[in-house]
Regions:
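C-terminal single-pass membrane-anchor helix
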Residues: 172-221
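Loop/turn-rich, solvent-exposed surfaces of beta-rich toroidal or solenoidal domains
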Residues: 66-109, 187-193
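Short glycine/serine/proline-enriched coil/turn segments at secondary-structure junctions
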Residues: 7-10, 39, 68-70, 94-96, ...
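Beta-propeller blade signature
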Residues: 41-57, 99-111, 154-175
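Short, conserved, GDST-rich strand-edge loop motifs in beta-rich repeat architectures
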Residues: 28-45, 89-99, 147-155
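Blade-level signature of beta-propeller repeat domains, shared across WD40, Kelch, NHL, RCC1
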Residues: 126-188
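Conserved blade-ending motifs and adjacent loop-strand segments that build the rim/top face
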Residues: 58-78, 108-136, 172-182
């Protein structure tokens, strides 16, 4: 049995875990639970992050933030190599027709940012689950969902998201910048056409005046 010093992690389920490259740091995020570990006395939605240091055999709570969102997290989370951010799939498990949303968590303070579009998932049975993976060779995130219904049917789906994932605001901002750039290109093109047409008309008018000019006759003394 391993003995860890430091902060206590209360009993919970529906929590997520991320591991660093050398497997010395384990991050545990969120879930549902309570101090006693007895579901009969109720459960709380947890919004906290713990760091388990296997080398130091210690547990440290990095933060615990209040949240208005009642969300649980998929078991597998993705930790960035610099251990500054964690990517996690969160969803309201109490909804039968629920949805998964990818979030980026800041390890230092717990700031959450929604990324990409949501993924629909039917969560009728407790065995229904979702998982998140990252392929460093293709730079893609993979989400798999396994759905069970009351008739015993199973449906497995896979979704792919190219890295780096961006937020909806960033997509809108990029679209606005692209539209502005296109608008300026059309304006500059219009100015260029006007200058070209004006130059051609000026040259033609000048040549016409030169042709119509009558030379004065010189007087002979």
């Amino acid at each position: 049995t391993l003995s860890y010093s430091g902060d206590r992690i209360i009993p919970r389920y529906f929590s997520g875990m991320a591991v660093n490259k050398n497997r010395e740091h384990i991050y545990v995020f969120g879930g549902m639970g309570n101090e006693s570990g007895e579901q009969s006395v109720g459960r709380n939605y947890l919004h906290d992050l713990y760091l388990l240091d296997r080398k130091q055999q210690s547990v440290r709570r990095l933060w615990q933030n209040a949240s208005d969102h009642r969300l649980v997290v998929a078991r597998d989370m993705i930790l960035t190599p610099d251990e500054k951010y964690i990517y996690a799939l969160c969803y309201p498990e109490y909804l039968s027709d629920t949805y998964l949303q990818l979030y980026r968590l800041t390890v230092d303070d717990g700031t959450m940012k929604a990324l990409g579009d949501s993924i629909p998932m039917r969560s009728e049975e407790i065995m229904t689950n979702a998982n998140l993976y990252y392929n460093s060779l293709t730079h893609e995130y993979y989400c798999t969902t396994t759905e069970f219904d009351k008739k015993g049917h199973t449906v497995i789906r896979t979704y792919v998201l190219s890295a780096p994932p961006v937020s909806l605001d960033e997509i809108r901002s990029y679209g606005s910048r692209s539209s502005l750039e296109i608008r300026w290109l059309w304006i500059m093109a219009g100015i260029g056409v006007l200058l070209l047409v004006g130059g051609v008309l000026f040259v033609r008018r000048k040549r016409g005046k030169q042709r119509n000019a009558v030379p004065e006759s010189s007087s002979v003394l």
